[in-house]
Amino acid sequence: SDIRRMHMLLDLLKTQGVKAALGFLEKAEDDGRSGERVTNRFLAIPVVHNFRISARDVGELHPKSQKVIDMVGEKIEDNPSTRILIFTEYRYTVNNLIQSLSDIDGVRVSKFIGQSTSGKQKGMTQKQQLARLEEFRSGEVNVLVATSVGEEGLDVPAADLVLMYEPVPSAIRSIQRRGRTARQRSGTVKTLIANDTRDQYVSRAAEIRERKMYSNLADIEQQKQKRLDFRTNM
């Protein structure tokens, strides 16, 4: 519906930035070309139409983008052999970050996304994914910008710095992302949270779920120990 799409557009503007919002509208335009009249109606809404026109010549205004540029630049300058893994929920943001980070001296950045293709957003084949992971492992690529496909399944090499462009509501997914830091030495994990946006709610929800999960695991372990003690004393 128009309301749902407008909510998504505003959410992207607040948590991701102008470029991601434009990417969302470009995908909607592709859907409209395939005959989705509802999508065409949404794009024709005056405020949406005017935003697309005015935002095309605007640089990225969201502070997250500059924060990533600063952190990556500092990390690479301090240690050129470092590995950095950046997670984001959206392919629009993957493309935007690659474009921004490519201008930094010493940064060899590439993307790591899923295999599905949506509109102009083509996915990666499994062969391409495996080749990209090997490039990251060897150092040919030292900054990898990934969607959720980098969380599990494939053997993603460990990183010295993991940046989460936005928090994720799932405690398990958050733990999996943090688990991508280097195991043999200290790694750093940072999550970018835009104030007064959905980011803050998602971050709090994930923290509560994670605490609850660990509490449940502790209860289970305690019950197992009680049963073990009972059998031992019989």
Question: Model-predicted segments: where are they?
Answer:
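Conserved RecA-like helicase motor core of SF1/SF2 enzymes
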Residues: 114-119, 141-142, 148-184, 194-196
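Long, largely alpha-helical accessory region at the distal end of helicase-like NTP-driven motors
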Residues: 1, 221-234
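Conserved catalytic network of the ASCE P-loop NTPase/AAA+ motor domain
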Residues: 76-80, 103, 134-139, 155-156, ...
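Conserved segment of the helicase C-terminal RecA-like domain
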Residues: 137, 176-213, 221
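Conserved helicase ATPase core of P-loop NTP-dependent helicases/translocases
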Residues: 83-87, 93-148
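Helicase motor interdomain insertion/brace
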Residues: 1-103
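Short beta-strand/turn micro-motifs composed of small residues
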Residues: 45, 88, 113, 191-193
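Alpha-helical elements of the RecA-like P-loop NTPase motor core of helicases
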Residues: 95, 99, 152, 172, ...
